[in-house]
Structures are given as C-alpha cells and as structure tokens.
Amino acid sequence: MKPKIHQQAYDRLGTLDLESFLNHLLLETPIPFKGHLIRCGSPRIRTFLKGISCAFCGIQATISAIERTADGLKSSSYHVNLYHVREDGTEVMMTSDHIHPKSKGGREDLFNRQPMCIICNLKKGSKILHTNPNAIQPDT
C-alpha cells in the first residue's frame, strides 16, 4: 500500500482518470463507478473547478480516487478525493481551503474556497494569508 498524507483513513474503491473526473465535475453529472453513482456537487469537490494545483506550493493533483471514510460505518458514501503523487509514491491529499477561515467569519461558498494540499492547509490553519503572506513556509 502506498503511503498517504491526509487527516483520516479511507477505503479506496479505485481510481478514476483525472480528465474523466474533471469532465463530470464541469458537466455536474454523477460518476458511474463499479456499481456506485459518485456525486460531484459538494462545495468541497466543486473547489477544484478553480484548478487542481495547491494555491500555496503549486503541487498539482495527479489522480482522483473514489473513496469513503474508513470508520466502519456502512452509511459512509463514496466520494472523490484528489491526490498529488510524489516520485516516491507517497500520495498527498488535495483539500478545499477556506481563504477567509470559517472560524473568523468566512463564508461557505465557492468564492471563499481554493485548492490546497493537505500539508499547506494544515500549516495555514486559521491564518488569513493575504494579511500575512509569510505565515507559512512551503516544504523544500
């Protein structure tokens, strides 16, 4: 199993061609995948209409995975997660960052979201970067 960098464990049903995922996202159509219909309408996933690169460090998603939370609940539905795959095979999850954090009054709409890798998102936390551009440093 390839190492992953994200916040929780997921059960992976499989991977989908990134271009195919983006087409479904643009057309707002569910993805038929191994007997499941995967929705593409959540605010989190619609963030990737803005791009598939981290707004801070610039790494780009290279795979889309059909996954569900691995918490043992059968009610957990499958959804799409995007990952950047490093040369060593490590998968870095791409997330939907709130530009103006919700904890500081930020809205839940698409205008207040940007794609960001989990590493930068965890470093950013609840900081507002446009007022403190040096708040986080990218990995080198």
Predicted regions and their residues:
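A boundary/linker detector
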Residues: 1-53, 58-65
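Histidine (H) residue identity feature
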Residues: 6, 10, 24, 36, ...
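The −1 position to Zn-ligating cysteines in a subset of zinc-ribbon hairpins
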Residues: 52-53, 95, 116
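Cys/His-rich metal-chelating microdomains
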Residues: 57-60, 102, 119-123
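Histidine-centered nuclease catalytic patch
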Residues: 61-113, 128
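Glycine-rich, phosphate-binding/catalytic loops in enzymes
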Residues: 71-73, 133-136
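Short Cys/His-centered divalent metal-binding micro-motifs
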Residues: 109, 113-135
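Short, intrinsically disordered terminal segments enriched in charged and Pro/Gly residues
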Residues: 139-140
